[in-house]
Every structure is written in C-alpha cells, then in structure tokens.
C-alpha cells in the first residue's frame, strides 16, 4: 500500500461498484468507513445520466467496531430490498474495511433468507487487485451466478438465434467513451446484418443474462473488462469470442474478418450460405472513413516523423500506438501502460511500433520520461494532460482515467469507422502547428507570455541576466525550451551559476562541435 495523490486505477471496490451500477435494477451496498464512499459523488459528477447512482454505504463507525457489523449490514440489505425491490444486491467491502476480517459471506447468507432479491458478496481480494481487475472479476461472477441459477431452474437450454448475433461484453459506467463506442458497434453490426443479442453490463438486466448463450459469438472491445466473462462462456458453452479492438482502419478490418470467420462456421447450416464482408470493409475504408485518405493528404504528411508519447490502459494505448506508427507515420518514442498485470500482452502488441516501452502506475515516472524525450505531442490520460500543460506539450486524451470534458454530450466514438475519423481529428489537432506560436509572438498575440522551459522541476540553481533573457525571448517559441535546457546543462557542467549571452553562444558552439 502506498500514499499517492493520483492513481491511474482506483481500489478494487470501485471496479465492483462500476459493474453493479451499470446493470439495470441492481443495488450495491458498500461496507466502508467514511472517506471510501466517494463513488456516488464521482459517478454523479462524471456520467451524463438522470438516474441516481444505486450505491448505499453501510458506514463502519465506532458503534460497528464495538458491536460488530452483522446487524447493520443485514439491516441495510433487507431495508434496500424492501425500498428499491432490486433484482440483485451486491455487497462489497473496501480495502479499509477488509482489515476487520469479518465473515461477510455469513451476513449475505443471513440477509438472503429474508430478501426477495438475490444477494451476493463480491468475490474480490481487495489487496491484490485494482479497479479494472475487480470489475472484470465481478462481471464474471454475476454472469456465472445467473447462468448457474438458470441451469438449476432448467430454463437455460435455448437454441442459438436464427440470424447471426453477438453479445457485447464490457461496456460499463465511467468507461472511456463507452456509450459512444457501443452505439458505433451497434451501427456496425446492423450494417453487417448481425443482431445484437445482449449488451452487458451497461443498461443490461441480470434477468436477461440467461439469454447470453443464444448468441453466435461474444465481442470483447476492451481487454480490461469482459475477458474473464468471455473465457467462462467459451469454456462452459463453447462460445467463441473476438477480443480484437476495432480501433483504427487496420484493426477494424481485422475485427470484421474475425467475426466473419466465426459466423461462417454456422452460416452454411443455419443460413444456407456463407457471409462475405470484404466489400463492406472496402466501401467503408475508401468512402465512409475519412482517415484513409487523410493519412495520404499533405496535412497528415506534415506529421511524418513527429515524435509522440502514448500512455494509458492496455487497450487504448496499444491501439493508439499502432494507429500513429502504422496509419499516420508518427514516430512513437515511448508507449506505456499502467495495467501492470497485462504487461506481456501490451509489449507483444507494440513491439516494432515504438522505441521504448514503459510499464508503471507511478505518474512521476511518466512525467520524467516525457520531460526526457521531449515529444511534439502526448496521447494519454487526464494525468498526461496535466503533465503536458506543465511542460507546454499538447496532449490528446485517449484513455481513462479522465475528467468531465471526456464525457461529451456529442457523439464521439473511438471504435469503428466513425471512430477512425475522431482519432484522425484528435491526432492532427494535438500537434502544435509549425510556426503558430512564433507568429503570434511576432505580431503581439501573446505579449504577456513568459519564457517557458520544459522541466518538471520547479527549482533552478541558475540565474539568467537581463541580456541573456532578452536574447532568449528573441528565439522562436517552438525551439526556445530546447535551447534554454541545453544552455543550462552546459552551465552546470562547467560550474557556472549565472548565465550570460556569452555562455549561451559558448553552449551553442559546444553543442555543434
């Protein structure tokens, strides 16, 4: 355990609550002290939804510590059962309340005797897993619970649908553009003549989980959440799954071809023909997606060789690295992820597309790396946006965790062919246009702008005299930071504490030599 003012992935109970609050008519009870109950506020602030967050905190206070939690937890479960009439109540402790080592499964069993709702305890180790791993595990646990229940009630043996159909697994609350991506995937499947059987957990009903085996295959757009469920369904029901993320022209085509491959196993029997989506891929790539011709335009060629850094969750960071390097000719200096548990897959995906791979959940390491490589643009999470502002480097947000501006009201998917257009816009608009800053300074656009330096350190042991500062301000903005850093580096190496114009020229000569 460590103290941090920023975490890329939150504690395990946040993942469990995200899954529970994504389903319709499911209530979560969080057994936690005050301070751990911020999920309601966070979700209400960020998600553009009208409904209240269905999460109740069962507070661990001094009375609970003195008498034990059973009475209070059982009372909260039965009260919510009577008030809300949910289909399912999920009880989760937090990492703090786990210290009490209470038998919460016993509390759940007690409450289930008097409740009309189903009651389960989230089966998550709060010290071993983070938010994303816990969400993946909880979703699989809920699906397994309801399919086992349907099996016991003998209403599970349903034939697969007559037309090709899919389940979309892993769309959930507070995800990065998840709702827009879901709409785009539904539109894509409609174009291909594929029926969407169920979408879980976002907007899904636990009572409909027994319908999951009716689909021909499962779609897992994001590796972080949904993979465990897809593996369970494959093992128990023989359902194939596609885990390729349809992000970018190349991977969207690969995604559609994988679906075609799986559908054609059943199509000759059930449809009397095989399906062929090649014409659709060609049509979308050449005429619907603007990204293919944009990547050949002079605007995109201006980006060729520009340096970029990519950091985020494994799904988005890997996909973005491949799009930049393969489809846009951008030079990715470093690609990284905070999902340390999936590091091997990430390294395998970005191999050959970037110079350096960074696997860390420490934002200071990411900041230091960005300051060191000095990219022209960053593609990352909310934290990389902050780092970019401090270093005066533009940043495009491509991954959770994000703030309110990345829960847009307008339609902005990142998946599918419309997603390729959004990504092309994001990439192009993230790079500072050549002489823009310099021209603004020349014509008085930024007359109050200070001379900036790209460094994460706020302390400097060097002073610049007025003449050298005036000389520095004459240098164009897009190279000024580099010259300032090189001069300061030269001064430190030679034991100088005050920088003059002469030292600036000496540093320039030393660098050229």
UniProtKB/Swiss-Prot annotation:
The UniProt entry, under InterPro entries, shows:
ChlB/BchB/BchZ, LI-POR_suB-like_C, Nase/OxRdtase_comp1, P-CP_red_C, Protochl_reductB, Protochlorophyllide_Rdtase
Q: Binding of substrate: at which residues?
A: 434-435
* Name used for this protein in its record: Light-independent protochlorophyllide reductase subunit B
Gene Ontology CC:
chloroplast
Give the record's GO biological process terms.
light-independent chlorophyll biosynthetic process; photosynthesis, dark reaction
The record's gene field reads: chlB
Q: What does this protein do?
A: Component of the dark-operative protochlorophyllide reductase (DPOR) that uses Mg-ATP and reduced ferredoxin to reduce ring D of protochlorophyllide (Pchlide) to form chlorophyllide a (Chlide). This reaction is light-independent. The NB-protein (ChlN-ChlB) is the catalytic component of the complex.
Q: What does the sequence similarity comment in the record state about its family?
A: Belongs to the ChlB/BchB/BchZ family.
Q: Which GO terms describe its molecular function?
A: 4 iron, 4 sulfur cluster binding; ATP binding; metal ion binding; oxidoreductase activity, acting on iron-sulfur proteins as donors; oxidoreductase activity, acting on the CH-CH group of donors, iron-sulfur protein as acceptor
Q: Subunit structure, briefly?
A: Protochlorophyllide reductase is composed of three subunits; ChlL, ChlN and ChlB. Forms a heterotetramer of two ChlB and two ChlN subunits.
Q: State the organism of origin.
A: Staurastrum punctulatum (Green alga)
């Amino acid at each position: 355990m460590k103290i941090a003012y920023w975490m890329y992935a939150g504690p395990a109970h946040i993942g469990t609550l995200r899954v529970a609050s994504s389903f319709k008519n499911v209530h979560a009870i969080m057994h936690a002290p005050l301070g751990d109950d911020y999920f309601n506020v966070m979700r209400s602030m960020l998600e553009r939804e009208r409904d209240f967050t269905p999460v109740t905190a069962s507070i661990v206070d001094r009375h609970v510590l003195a008498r034990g939690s059973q009475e209070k937890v059982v009372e909260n479960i039965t009260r919510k059962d009577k008030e809300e009439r949910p289909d399912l109540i999920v009880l989760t402790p937090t990492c703090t309340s786990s210290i009490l080592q209470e038998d919460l499964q016993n509390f759940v069993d007690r409450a289930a005797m008097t409740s009309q709702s189903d009651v389960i305890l989230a089966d998550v180790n709060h010290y071993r897993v983070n938010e994303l791993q816990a969400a993946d595990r909880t979703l699989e646990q809920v699906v397994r619970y309801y399919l086992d229940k349907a099996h016991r009630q003998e209403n599970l043996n349903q034939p697969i649908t007559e037309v090709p159909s899919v389940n979309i697994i892993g769309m959930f609350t507070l995800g990065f553009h998840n709702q827009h991506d879901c709409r785009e995937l539904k539109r894509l499947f409609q174009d291909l003549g594929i029926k969407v059987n169920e979408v879980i957990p976002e907007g899904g009903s636990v009572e409909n989980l027994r319908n999951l085996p009716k689909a021909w295959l499962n779609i897992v757009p994001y590796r972080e959440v949904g993979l465990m469920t897809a593996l369970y369904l494959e093992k128990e029901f023989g359902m194939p799954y596609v885990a390729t993320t349809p992000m970018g022209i190349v991977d969207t085509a690969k995604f559609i071809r994988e679906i075609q491959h799986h559908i054609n196993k059943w199509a000759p029997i059930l449809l009397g023909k095989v399906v062929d989506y090649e014409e659709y891929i060609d049509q979308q790539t050449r005429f619907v997606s603007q990204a293919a011709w944009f990547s050949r335009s002079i605007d995109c060629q201006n980006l060729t060789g520009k340096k970029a850094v990519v950091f985020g969750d494994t799904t988005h960071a890997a996909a973005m690295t491949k799009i930049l390097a393969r489809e846009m000719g951008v030079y990715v200096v470093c690609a990284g992820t905070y999902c340390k548990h999936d590091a091997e897959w990430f390294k395998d995906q970005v191999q050959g597309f970037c110079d350096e791979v960074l696997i860390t959940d420490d934002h200071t390491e990411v900041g230091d790396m960005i300051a060191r490589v000095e990219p022209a643009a960053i593609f990352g999470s909310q934290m990389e946006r902050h780092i970019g502002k401090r270093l005066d480097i533009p940043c495009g947000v491509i991954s959770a965790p994000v703030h309110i501006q990345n829960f847009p009201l307008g339609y902005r998917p990142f998946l599918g062919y419309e997603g390729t257009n959004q990504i092309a816009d994001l990439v192009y608009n993230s790079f500072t246009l050549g002489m823009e800053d310099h021209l603004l300074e020349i014509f008085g656009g930024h007359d109050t702008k200070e001379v900036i330096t790209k460094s994460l350190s706020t302390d400097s042991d060097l002073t610049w005299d007025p003449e050298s500062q005036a000389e520095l301000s004459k240098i164009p903005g897009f190279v000024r930071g580099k010259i300032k850093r090189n001069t300061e580096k030269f001064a430190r190496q030679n034991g100088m504490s005050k920088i003059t114009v002469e030292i600036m020229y000496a540093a320039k000569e030393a660098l050229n030599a």
